[in-house]
């Protein structure tokens, strides 16, 4: 599915700037990303369904397929060179002005059962089940006919949230709450 939308309809100039900047950076690296999480939900609900989410967010979650952790380090270096600030506390997190950017790697970097283990200690584990399938069913969104981003579909977001809930339902109810959108 493909959509063409106006940045004015997104209603968040900083988000559009961030998406444009990410697109330029990832194109230069010859890498693909797609938007997941609440921002994907909000864009799709507003553009396709015509309703807005009750919860606003100032964070952006993206997924990238990488073969190994060295590639993630290369992505990190390019983003920092392009003006993103790397979090000192969270391995997946970057900052762009007021936005938090979380990058979820998947693909060959995952180990058995589609689990990633953040280096070097590998003590933080995260399930990335279904990420390939969600990408293959993503929506390509052209913004102002200037650049395009891939966004997880609503059913893809539900699959990712369901897996996250199964993975961490004893720790948090956030994923179940997010599935109720």
Predicted feature locations:
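Compositionally biased terminal segments of proteins
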Residues: 1-181
